[in-house]
């Protein structure tokens, strides 16, 4: 070991250990450059975040525009469908009205103005003239044929004697047997002949009388009819519209000033959610003596609702894609005591 405390083999060197333990101190320039790089990275990150937010906002705007375009397309499709249904209803009413008039019009009548199909009375007149001789011929044939069927045919003398001979050997007069058989079968057949001939004469007279009607008499004959006939003729011209909950919105009531959707009631009927015959408020008051129940609103049956839809569609005043306001169409009679709150 020398004076400095160092060993010759180099194991113990205090000065060398002091050099390794010293840390490298960066300069001020290096610190400033590192801070500047960090600030630049932060700015780039903030720019990227702002660009991302702008892209998300543009995407949301595109989504909104797409949704509005889809809604407009759906509205256009619904308007087109409603217009097509209205046109179809009118075409069907124009087609069915002349057919109803043709079926209900006797000879010589005049169809109201505005109907495309006209009735030709001379063709019906020719058809009746052609039909009358057939009836008269059939009547004469029945008169000629029926009495022969009613009177018994006289069989040969030998056959009557053989069939009329009793087993004990008694002789029976063949004239008496034929007369008794005729007496047994004759009156009923004669009645039948008279009845059929009278029916044929009635048919002929009915055709003649209907043929001899003038225009005024025929118009009077049309006006004289039962109320059910008039009602059936009116209903033939109307198109029966059936409510379809998949394509048509439920009806509403605007008695409170706000459109309130109605409740389903019965078989296709509807019940008001905001009015009774004496009260108009929403919601209707609850019953104190009945749990989960309110005062019953005004009602409309399913058949009445379908008739209302048919009338509105025939008049063309209402678009079936919009809900029907039942404010002025409710039934005049009373309602049930309560409705269940759902």
Swiss-Prot record:
Quaternary structure (record): Homodimer. Heterodimer with BPC4.
Q: Which stretches does the entry tag as region Required for nucleus and nucleolus localization?
A: 164-195
Motif (Nuclear localization signal) positions are 192-195
Annotated region Alanine-zipper: the residues are 41-76
Q: What does this protein do?
A: Transcriptional regulator that specifically binds to GA-rich elements (GAGA-repeats) present in regulatory sequences of genes involved in developmental processes.
Q: Which gene encodes it?
A: BPC6
Task: Show the GO cellular component annotation of the record.
Answer: nucleolus; nucleus
Residue numbers spanned by region Disordered: 143-199
Asked if the Swiss-Prot or TrEMBL record annotates the protein with the keyword Ligase, the reply is: no
Q: Where in the cell is it found?
A: Nucleus; Nucleus, Nucleolus
Name the principal localization, coarsely classed.
nucleus
Q: What is this protein called?
A: Protein BASIC PENTACYSTEINE6
Name the family the entry cites.
Belongs to the BBR/BPC family.
Query: Which Gene Ontology BP annotations are present?
Result: response to ethylene
- A Gene Ontology molecular-function term? transcription cis-regulatory region binding
Q: Provide the domain comment.
A: Alanine-zipper domain is involved in homo- or hetero-dimerization via electrostatic interaction.
Native source species: Arabidopsis thaliana
Where along the sequence do coiled-coil regions lie? 41-67
Keyword field: Coiled coil, DNA-binding, Nucleus, Transcription, Transcription regulation
Tissue note: Expressed in seedlings, leaves and pistils. Detected in the base of flowers and tips of carpels, in sepal vasculature, in young rosette, in the lateral and tip of primary roots, and in ovule at the exception of the outer integument.
Q: Where is the composition biased (Basic residues)?
A: 185-194
Which is a Pfam family this sequence falls into? GAGA_bind
């Amino acid at each position: 070991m020398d004076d400095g405390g160092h060993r010759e083999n180099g194991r113990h060197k205090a000065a060398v250990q002091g050099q390794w333990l010293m840390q490298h101190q960066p300069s001020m320039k290096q610190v400033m450059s590192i801070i500047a790089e960090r600030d630049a990275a932060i700015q780039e990150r903030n720019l990227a975040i702002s660009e991302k937010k702008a892209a998300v906002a543009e995407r949301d705007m595109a989504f909104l525009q797409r949704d509005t375009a889809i809604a407009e397309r759906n509205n256009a499709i619904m308007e087109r469908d409603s217009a097509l249904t209205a046109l179809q209803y009118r075409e069907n009413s124009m087609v069915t009205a002349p057919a109803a008039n043709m079926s209900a019009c006797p000879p010589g009548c005049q169809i109201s103005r505005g109907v495309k199909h006209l009735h030709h009375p001379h063709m019906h007149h020719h058809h009746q003239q052609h039909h009358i001789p057939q009836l008269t011929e059939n009547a004469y044939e029945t008169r000629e044929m029926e009495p022969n069927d009613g009177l018994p045919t006289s069989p040969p003398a030998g056959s009557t004697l053989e069939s009329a001979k009793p087993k004990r050997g008694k002789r029976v007069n063949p004239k008496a047997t034929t007369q008794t058989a005729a007496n047994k079968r004759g009156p009923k057949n004669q009645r039948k002949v008279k009845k059929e001939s009278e029916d044929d004469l009635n048919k002929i007279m009915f055709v003649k009388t209907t043929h001899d009607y003038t225009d005024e008499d025929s118009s009077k004959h049309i006006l004289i009819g039962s109320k059910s006939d008039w009602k059936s003729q009116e209903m033939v011209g109307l198109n029966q519209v059936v409510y379809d909950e998949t394509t048509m919105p439920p009806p509403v009531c605007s008695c409170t000033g706000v459109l309130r959707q109605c409740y389903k009631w019965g078989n296709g009927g509807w019940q008001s959610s905001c009015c009774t015959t004496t009260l108009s408020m929403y919601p209707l008051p609850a019953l104190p003596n009945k749990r989960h129940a309110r005062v019953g609103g005004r009602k409309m049956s399913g058949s009445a609702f379908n008739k209302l839809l048919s009338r509105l569609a025939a008049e063309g005043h209402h678009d079936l894609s919009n809900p029907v306001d039942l404010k002025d169409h409710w039934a005049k009679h009373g309602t049930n005591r309560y409705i269940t709150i759902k």
